[in-house]
């Protein structure tokens, strides 16, 4: 039996479907799905992992013996050697936590244990015990094993860990590696026909990253959390890549705060090419505006003098007309970073982009999405890909045009690697095949691919210099003369700015000028897409980790909004670390560690060397921080309070703050004077931010609430405020009471205490009928009742449009709808799809 180990269950299904001579048989081993099939008479079994099945963790304690030195003690009592520097104290210790008679306890979060934690041995613990059990059961019976996880550092490490589990029960079975870049039949068939050995160096590079990130993340996060400060939430996160990334954002904010705006004046003239003199209506097809040749007047007097000279003028002389054509080259193929940047410009965050891309890859619509490469390999049949996606009517005519123009030639980026090709579509998809968000990203990728096979666009630029009473004005216009790649790839395309046909020496109407005072603006904040590009430029993170790092900064409330703005807490963390341990916040050290991991992958360094260097670097930074813990604590405490501030308490005058319930983790507003002051206000679900504006109705503070998939809305924090009141709406008759012969109404209302909306029976005390409602949107009753449960149908009107629903969560019809959706999705995934792959 040949055992094939994949990274996820979906991959196990796909490979079994693509390789099997007939439909694979779905089975279970200890509750883990596996898929059995035959290839040329041989039994094959695929099993999908759940990503990493082993995870690194510190030993729970360290112990010291004079003869043996330091050792880590695992949970099972096994002893692992530890290299702890002589500068750290040795036993005997007084028995005061975290110290024991002969060592140090590391499991509890204690400040005194952090210097020792840096040097604690790291063991690999089972993360997915059920899957490991199933894997070993199959491995025991296997004649050969194929590791078919994703081909990158992370995938090689996952495969290496899976192999180590297999080797515990089968030490002799031959092992090979399948490398592929897309879930298409030609690609998977080629990969399994050309198996290669495992790459131990690549796995070691992935392992070093996990170990180093564990050490830095655990030590710095514990340090920032253990220095006491007020505020909602407990853990304050930090990490090897996360912290310098935050520092980039904070540094840009410092530049903005230090920026001193300067006044300048802009003069714009109004012209009309349809007349020789003004004034004219100014709204005809040949009317246009042009700025003064001096784009910015730095002195108001100079601008006023220019305005005085053109005052009263009614005509302008066309001094010169220049036309020039320029080529705009077609874009290069997508790698991960450029895809995230382009998707961000279309409103898809980097983290969401990668989630969607992973889904499209697993469903066989695009190639592997975590790549650095920007050059298509010779093995990729470009014409075959074009033919495959031509099934989409939106691309069909353009694909035919490309194929009829001769041999296809693609653009080339600066980065060429041999592991995976750039991201390209592998199968045709239409809006009917995918969700709106998934198709939006697929469409971007497919159009980008076609654009890379297209010619440059030609833009004709026109520059007209106009003379008004001796004052020069300059009008510029751009027109797309030859669309080239722009015919299929409209992203980032500027609207044509067409000027009327003007001849040199002619006279046209001048309709006056305006002078506007403006100020220079500070450097722009980073968008998520721009930040990903900056991280790549500085060597922070990898193509696989950058999106999740940015997402993490939002989760721990270090940043907010997009473009990205640091919170007071985020600024305080960087200020404190930058003052006492600056290397932690600087990109250079992290980038050097990334280069060291590259050298591990190339076999030029060992994992042990790189991890040891990293431990020593962190130990020095922690030694710099420890004496200044009180200062760090004060800075963080003030920042958290500032971020949480909502307004003054109406009862005692102290600060009202955003807080999180320790029990439910839900947000509420409470007074900083608690327990002496018990003022609290409930908050709806969603992202909550304080806003400076007071409620125009009652004068209380307001907050901005962003509910899931909803637009932000500002509301008063006081539930009793008239602005929070909604009229009760009778939506229909209660079906429960009707069965009892009672005529009772169902009423939609908002609870004044919790602010939650629901439909309740006016006879609620006896019948207890209640249906939840969406928290936002106008409620419109209908005269219809649900055919499945008898509940009244209601219409919810939101900014996205009206939608009708049955409010009963337990309605049998909902289960039928979900079943129908699942069947529809399954039919699509099994349906025939034209695919393309490498030769």
Could you describe each region identified by the protein language model?
Residues 39-47, 51-124, 233-358, 362, ...:
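Long, highly charged, low-complexity internal segments
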Residues 141, 185-269, 324:
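C-terminal or mid-to-C-terminal helical accessory/interaction module adjacent to the motor/catalytic core
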Residues 184-186, 367, 373:
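Short, charge-patterned binding micro-sites
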Residues 11, 124-138, 154-162, 184-188, ...:
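Helical mechanochemical/support elements of P-loop NTPase systems and associated helical scaffolds
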Residues 149-151, 341-343, 370:
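Short glycine-centered, acidic/aromatic-flanked micro-motifs in structured strand/loop junctions
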